[in-house]
Amino acid sequence: MRIYSLLILSFLLLASAVLINSAEMPRSEKSLLYSIMQGREDSEEGRCLGPMDECNVFDDNCCAGWLKCNCDWGFAGNCRCSKTPKEG
């Protein structure tokens, strides 16, 4: 019973982290947070194309299909579009 409780708790924590990351923020707060998180920006990375401000590894259209989406935590967190073509 204890293992099931830990599994459910860990799933809920993961789900809440994804929801918090994808939640819409006011534009002023988002731009402030965006400028703080850009300290590691380099010339090989760029902003997403289209209406989205951040890329998503599950949405190829965000990076125009031929660019690769890289995130700090694999699928979320400070996602950036890379100029490297996707493999496969």
Swiss-Prot record:
<feature type="disulfide bond">
    <location>
        <begin position="71"/>
        <end position="79"/>
    </location>
</feature>
<protein>
    <recommendedName>
        <fullName>U18-hexatoxin-Hi1a</fullName>
    </recommendedName>
</protein>
<feature type="disulfide bond">
    <location>
        <begin position="62"/>
        <end position="81"/>
    </location>
</feature>
<dbReference type="GO" id="GO:0005576">
    <property type="term" value="C:extracellular region"/>
</dbReference>
<keyword id="KW-0800">Toxin</keyword>
<keyword id="KW-1015">Disulfide bond</keyword>
<feature type="signal peptide">
    <location>
        <begin position="1"/>
        <end position="17"/>
    </location>
</feature>
<comment type="function">
    <text>Weak insecticidal toxin with probable ion channel impairing activity. In vivo, induces paralysis when injected into sheep blowflies (L.cuprina). Shows weak toxicity, since it is only toxic at high doses, and flies recover within 24 hours.</text>
</comment>
<keyword id="KW-0732">Signal</keyword>
<feature type="propeptide">
    <location>
        <begin position="18"/>
        <end position="47"/>
    </location>
</feature>
<dbReference type="GO" id="GO:0090729">
    <property type="term" value="F:toxin activity"/>
</dbReference>
<keyword id="KW-0872">Ion channel impairing toxin</keyword>
<feature type="disulfide bond">
    <location>
        <begin position="48"/>
        <end position="63"/>
    </location>
</feature>
<keyword id="KW-0964">Secreted</keyword>
<comment type="similarity">
    <text>Belongs to the neurotoxin 07 (Beta/delta-agtx) family. 02 (aga-3) subfamily.</text>
</comment>
<feature type="disulfide bond">
    <location>
        <begin position="55"/>
        <end position="69"/>
    </location>
</feature>
<dbReference type="GO" id="GO:0099106">
    <property type="term" value="F:ion channel regulator activity"/>
</dbReference>
